[in-house]
């Protein structure tokens, strides 16, 4: 796991744009889905489709720090598997007991990429820390050396070797998505914000079909590299007419990895 300081503010102007945008995304999600439904799904504070809520979110995909990581690890044909916002409330405000919270996916030890590929890197995370990450406000805990393992470590091993990743606001964690990690519990009395990006090889299915979710008009309003990251050049054809197109008009462009 690598920590890069100052990444979140490099192209998003400043962190103060991101915080209200995340609050807006949370409000829109709660209106659409409802708080009770989110609690049943154990998704309180998780923001899944927010790219069209505020321009600051697609702008994050232009950050040089992120693009350099993606290009170096997965090549420039990689695509965005997900962009998730996290507004981690204090545990007492979540509507769960501490014991219940520890069983929620993001709080339990897990891997974001669960396949063992004999050392082949298929998926990379770039986690932007919008607020300072401290153990007291639920900093992500990592278990060093647990990426690319053929067999799962025991829970006792994970608990004994987990390290809270503390870092200042505006920093970015970069890590192999197969490393074991989990969110800590927030006991600070205040929300803790972060935005996670997971990137994969272009032939791996996205968590969200961003082209369908956002619409072609929105996608085409973005820079070409952002279009590519969102999957615009790796769409799946639905008819013979779409298949038999010249190379520059094909939904799945050549040389996409």
Which residues fall in each region the model found?
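Non-heme Fe(II)-dependent double-stranded beta-helix
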Residues: 2-110, 114-116
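Short hydrophobic-aromatic micro-motifs
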Residues: 2, 128, 173-175
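A structural signal for short, well-ordered beta-strand segments
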Residues: 83-85, 126-128, 195-199
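Conserved double-stranded beta-helix
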Residues: 149-150, 154-174, 178-179, 184-257
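Catalytic core of non-heme Fe(II) oxygenases with the double-stranded beta-helix
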Residues: 94-167, 204-214
């Amino acid at each position: 796991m690598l920590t890069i300081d100052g990444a979140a503010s490099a192209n998003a102007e400043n962190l103060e744009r991101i915080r209200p945008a995340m609050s807006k995304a949370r409000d829109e999600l709660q209106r659409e889905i409802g708080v009770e439904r989110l609690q049943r799904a154990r998704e309180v504070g998780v923001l899944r489709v927010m790219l069209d809520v505020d321009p600051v979110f697609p702008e994050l995909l232009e950050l040089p720090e992120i693009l350099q990581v993606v290009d170096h690890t997965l090549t420039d044909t990689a695509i965005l598997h997900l962009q998730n916002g996290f507004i981690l409330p204090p545990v007492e405000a979540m509507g769960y007991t501490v014991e219940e919270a520890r069983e929620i996916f993001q709080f339990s030890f897990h891997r974001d990429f669960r396949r063992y590929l004999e050392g082949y890197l298929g998926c990379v995370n770039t986690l932007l820390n919008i607020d300072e990450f401290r153990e007291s406000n639920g900093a992500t805990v990592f278990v060093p050396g647990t990426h690319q393992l053929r067999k799962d470590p025991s829970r006792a091993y994970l608990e004994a070797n987990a390290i809270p990743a503390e870092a200042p606001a505006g920093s970015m964690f970069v890590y192999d998505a197969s490393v074991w990690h989990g969110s800590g519990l927030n006991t600070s009395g205040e929300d803790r914000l972060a935005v996670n990006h997971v990137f994969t090889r272009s032939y791996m299915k996205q968590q969200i079909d961003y082209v369908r979710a956002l619409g072609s008009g929105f996608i085409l309003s973005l820079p070409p590299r952002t279009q590519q990251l969102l999957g615009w050049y790796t769409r799946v054809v639905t008819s013979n007419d779409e298949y038999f197109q010249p190379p520059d008009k094909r939904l799945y462009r050549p040389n996409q990895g």
